């Protein structure tokens, strides 16, 4: 039986030092970096996403950044397909894929595969919405309870979006959302070493986030969002503009809040994102080696030692 090739996950909350550590590893190990970040995929969104600088990218080129226009959408399934392709290319060249980022849903999709849920069907969605106008979303929720009791109990009767999706899946496939999500996708054909980096003191992370946000403002974050807002095809409901920081700055430019409020809300939203990322990592089912952001040298050595223990020739 062929031995699975090695892949490395370097996960962690925003502002935890993932990029710096990835660059350090790139100077030592035969690795190629793949970004695992739902914001870095967008072109023209450099400052607010803390995208690696030109100098950093010269030291450690990142795959899967700047691959989409902000008007486009991107799913976990899209990421899995793209990442697997990039990983295969890297492995074929005799190097090791190093996947770096904080979008935990992408890691989960890559590691475990995806349930075979169908793509959205605009016609069926329109039919469901027309029916909702007749009997209300509460009526459709009762219909969902009859079709898929488990999903119906989990979904709030006022959550029209999720009710619509659950019914849409059933109308398209003839199977319930519960049935389909129980079907696991293909697992990742790699021997994966998983690392997570974060400061042991949460207050340090909060301080880093605040400092980084003010630094982004100095670098021209407001002007970056102004440029995006000047485009007629972009609006605040797009996934790209819903990224933390961008949404709050957009609200300021719309005149809904003051600049100070936008900065404060942006910092708070980023801290909340970091909290969700850490919570997800704490509940991660797979084995993770934790690294301390405040000791990057030790973190690098710890990763190298772990890789060596797995009989990988460096």
Swiss-Prot record:
Domain of life of the organism encoding this protein: Bacteria
Binding-site list for ATP: 12-19
Region entry Interaction with substrate tRNA, spans: 37-40, 161-165, 242-247, 275-282
Listed InterPro entries: Dimethylallyltransferase, IPT, P-loop_NTPase
Self-association and partners: Monomer.
Protein task: Catalyzes the transfer of a dimethylallyl group onto the adenine at position 37 in tRNAs that read codons beginning with uridine, leading to the formation of N6-(dimethylallyl)adenosine (i(6)A).
The protein's name: tRNA dimethylallyltransferase
Upper classification of the organism: Bacteria, Pseudomonadati, Pseudomonadota, Gammaproteobacteria, Pasteurellales
Gene: miaA
